[in-house]
Amino acid sequence: MSRKLTDYTTAAERSDLDILIKVGVSVSAYKAAMTRLGFSLGSIYPVSEHWPVLLVSTSEDADFLTKGFMDALTQRQIPFKLAVFWNNHYQINGDSVAPITQKYLQDGWQYSRSVVLLKSVISGSCVVRTNLLALLAEIDVAFLERH
């Protein structure tokens, strides 16, 4: 497997990424590595204004990657809101579709000024696009323009 890492990737992060592609890795090792990677990302997230950051996640990433990111923001006292989506991703006539079957939008999510979309595996843009478009359709643009 070929991957390209930035100069900012630490040895610990490289080790965690290696765990994720290791054949036969235990569930607990995978969970711990994914949570640490989320924490690493949350640790370098730039501090913004007093507005909460909106964390957007699929349900399968919420347990580990997103949790690690949330833990880092909590430790840094950066406010956040959470949006989690459940999708039914499938192919129909050669096209990829991913309708939303359930969603959780934490109260006040629409007042966030920045969005972090956390996704561990992006095999295509279908799920990401569907979830992001659903959020954008619900944003109160008039509120954002006033503030």
Regions found by a protein language model. Give the residues of each.
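PRPP-associated nucleotide enzymes
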Residues: 1-147
